[in-house]
Amino acid sequence: MPELPEVETVRRGLEKLILGKKISNIDIRYPKMIKTDLYEFQKEIHGQVIQSRGRRGKYLLFYLDDKVLISHLRMEGKYFYYPDQVPERKHAHVLIHFEDGGTLVYEDVRKFGTLELLAPELLDSYFISKKLGPEPTEKDFDLGSFKLALKKSKKPIKSHLLDQTLVAGLGNIYVDEVLWRAKVHPSRTSNSLTAQEARKVHDETINVLGQAVEKGGSTIRTYTNAFGEDGTMQEFHQVYDKAGQACSRCETIIEKIQLGGRGTHFCPKCQRRK
C-alpha cells in the first residue's frame, strides 16, 4: 500500500503534469470507486480547472475551481498522465480528459481505491470524521499530545501507529522502520513506553518519513511515481522484508511475526519486549 512518502511523491509529480488543466469530461469504468453520487460527481467535475494539488496523510487532494477531489490509492492505485493518445490498459478505471487533449488515468489492479468530490469548506470536518492524526512534521506533530495518547492506550504500539489517529501517513513498511530505529518492540503496549522511548518514536517517525519522501518512496512490488519511475527508499530499509538477514546494528538475525494480521519485522536484540 502506498504510504505517505509514496503519495507525496505522486502529488509532486502530478503537480508538474496537470496543474492549470481544464477537465472536459471523465470516463468512469468502475463506478464503485466513486463515493459521491455518480451523477453529481460527473456533473460537478465537468469544466473544473485543477488549481493546485495537496495531500493529507495518505489522501491525494485535487483543488478545483470550487470543489476538492479526494483520492485514496489504497493497495495498488496509480496515476499516469498521457499528453495525447491513451494506450489500452486493463486496469484503467477512471480517465480524466482535459481540454488540451491530455488524459489523467487512474489504474488500480485491486480496485480498492476511492474518489469523492467535496466542497472545500467541508474538508476539515471530513478528516475529523476519519479521526486522522496530525501530519508527521515538527510543526504539526506535537510530542506532548503524542505521549498523552500513548499513555491512554493498551494497543500494541505498531497497531496504534497504523490506525492513523496518532499521526497520519504511516503504513506497514515505515512503522517497522521507525520502531527499529527507536529500538522499540512492535508488540509492546503503547502505555508501556517510557517518555524517552515515546520521544524517540516521535522523532524517528518524522525522520523516516522525511527521508522516504526525499528518496521518492519505496518500490517493493509495483509502486511507481507519476512518471513511471521507481522509488529508492527500499535501499535504506533496515528491517522491512529482511527476515533471516543480519541486523545492521548488532548482527542478530531479523525476525518476522504476525501482529494484528500484519507481517512485522524486528530485531529481537535491539528491540526487546521487556
For each of these PLM feature ranges, what is it?
Residues 2, 6, 138, 197:
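Catalytic cores of large soluble enzymes that bind and process phosphate-bearing ligands
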Residues 69-169, 174-181, 189:
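Phosphate/anion-contacting hairpin/loop surfaces
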Residues 22-40, 54, 145, 149-274:
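Basic, nucleic-acid-binding surfaces and adjacent catalytic neighborhoods in DNA/RNA-processing proteins
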